[in-house]
From Swiss-Prot:
InterPro entries: SMIM10 (IPR029367). It comes from the Eukaryota. This is Small integral membrane protein 10-like protein 2A.
Amino acid sequence: MAASAALSAAAAAAALSGLAVRLSRSAAARGSYGAFCKGLTRTLLTFFDLAWRLRMNFPYFYIVASVMLNVRLQVRIE
């Protein structure tokens, strides 16, 4: 039972990673803002990976890491 739960969680993490890579590629094709999106996507994926490895809740880990590294999620509104 635990092995199947771990496999499904790993599959979900792989799907999320694949989606983020596709989104970063499409964002990079849009222009200079794409470079920022690509870096932000990598940062979020790194935080997600660390939270997964440490078995922590992602929002809690993101807030703590953001405060420590002074990283802010900024959205450009047009």
